Regions:
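Metal-dependent phosphoester-hydrolase catalytic domains
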Residues: 21-31, 247-262, 267-398
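Bacterial N-terminal signal peptides that target proteins for export
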Residues: 1-8
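N-terminal, active-site-proximal structural segment of metallo-dependent hydrolase catalytic domains
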Residues: 8, 18-107, 113-126, 130, ...
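Sec-exported extracytoplasmic/periplasmic mature domains
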Residues: 78-82, 101-109, 146, 250-254, ...
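Structured beta-strand-rich core segments of catalytic domains in phosphoester-bond hydrolases
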Residues: 26-33, 90-205
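Acidic/histidine-rich helix-loop elements
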Residues: 43-69, 161-170, 199-237
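Active-site beta-strand/loop signature of hydrolases that rely on acidic residues for catalysis
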Residues: 40-46, 73-98, 141, 180, ...
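Short aromatic-enriched loop/helix-cap "lid" or pocket-rim segments at secondary-structure transitions
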Residues: 52-57, 98-99, 125-129, 153, ...
Length: 398
């Protein structure tokens, strides 16, 4: 009986081995994964909802308002589904960065994130801070199957001190850049990606300069030179920040071969400004210049975005200080001209690149702009969404 059973088992094993060797029983060969035909990258200043003064920070919206803006933003992100998302004014970190990941996961999207705090006040440990609601900063999200690795939280400018996830010491305005590398496993290509929020100060340098120069020519503003020096200081600080950024990007490129470089954020300068020209001389291209139709979208528009209009109500402390020695009449004139200048729509958010998907068709559009006038906005800025396509008809249809 046992011998018969062994004979049967042996025969079945032999038959199964033979069947597996037959062509009809070969396991299917793994199918090659086709790389995606489009790649989307978004930069967006999300608005932290804080009022920042020289010595203090306070929340200027209710928790309900903050949550409503976040929910709207997640819906907009889920619809656009960018492959890489560059965010500024993400507060508080690291909690808010993880909130983005989890909220997008609930929409069926799998993202990973890296982040860097750029404003923290005095924070000695988790839960032990002078400004407990402040741990603002930058985040980069990458959609699966992309992988992301943080390279550097780079301090661009500011006094001694620094900010981290759970501890930090800040004695004045700090500005950081967040550098990361993003790899596409389907192609094996790795890209150098960065985001930053540059110094603001007295905004619209060139326009305000023209307005104040005109007032000075009419016999107003006896301390005009002091105002001009303050404007130039803001410009100079941003140039230093860009120099620090570009030096770091070059260093990373020396140690690793990247298929391209792209960075973006709220840069607080405008087209043809000295800072804009500085990037051009360094070999970086404003991607709007190479996009189909060369769109020049206004990313900050106080006339159509109520959140932006509200942000412009407060005058920059540096501007108030620079006017302190002027007569009341001249102060009022300078403020009027300043408000006129900053009330105009303008482009201060950018995506700059170097050798990034240069063979693709590129289109650029605004992100987060309400479809109808009066609909809510999720930020005081509109984002910029770049779509790179390797199907030429996507360009021909526009």
């Amino acid at each position: 009986m046992n011998r018969c059973r062994l004979l049967v088992i042996g025969t079945m094993a032999w038959l199964l081995t033979g069947c597996q060797a037959m062509p009809g029983f070969m396991p299917p060969a793994p199918q090659p994964v086709e790389p995606p035909t489009t790649f989307k990258i978004l930069t967006y200043n999300t608005l932290h909802g804080l009022e920042v003064s020289k010595l203090w920070v306070r929340q200027v919206e209710t928790d309900k308002q903050h949550k409503a803006r976040f929910t709207l933003r997640i819906m907009q992100l889920a619809e656009a589904q960018p492959d890489v998302i560059l965010l500024q004014e993400v507060n508080p970190l690291p909690v808010m960065a993880e909130d983005y990941v989890q909220a997008l996961k609930q929409q069926g999207l799998d993202y990973a994130e890296v982040h860097q705090v750029d404003a923290c006040g005095l924070r000695l440990a988790p839960g032990l801070a002078i400004l407990p609601g402040l741990n603002n900063g930058l985040a980069i999200l990458a959609k699966a199957p992309l992988t992301i690795r943080k390279l550097d939280g780079l301090k661009l400018s500011g006094p001694l001190g620094g900010c981290g996830d759970y501890a930090g010491v800040q004695f004045g305005e700090l500005r950081y850049a967040l550098l990361a590398e993003v790899t596409a496993p389907t192609t094996g290509m790795t890209y150098l990606v960065a985001t930053m929020h540059l110094h603001s100060g007295i905004e619209r340098d060139a326009k305000v300069l023209h307005e104040l120069m005109e007032a000075h020519s009419q016999g107003r503003l006896q301390h005009y030179d002091q105002l001009m020096a303050e404007l130039k200081m803001d410009e100079h600080r941003r140039q230093i920040e860009l120099h620090t950024l570009m030096d770091a990007l070059r260093q990373h490129q020396m140690h690793q071969h990247y298929a391209g470089v792209i960075f973006g954020g709220d840069l607080n300068f405008e087209v043809e400004s000295p800072e804009y020209q500085q990037l051009g001389r360094a070999g970086f291209t404003d991607t709007a210049q190479i996009a189909v139709g060369m769109p020049m979208w206004n990313t900050y528009d106080p006339m159509s975005n109520p959140l932006a209009g509200h942000e412009e109500e407060a005058l920059p402390p540096a501007f108030i200080e620079a006017l302190a020695q002027e007569m009341k009449m001249d102060q009022d004139e300078a403020v009027k001209r300043y408000r006129h200048a900053i009330g105009m729509a303008r482009r201060i958010d950018f995506l700059f690149s170097m050798a990034f998907m240069s063979n693709a068709c590129l289109t650029q559009e605004l992100f987060g702009k309400p479809a109808m006038m009066g609909d809510p906005s999720s930020s005081d800025h509109y984002g910029l969404l770049n779509t790179y396509s390797y199907q030429r008809r996507d360009c021909e249809q526009r």
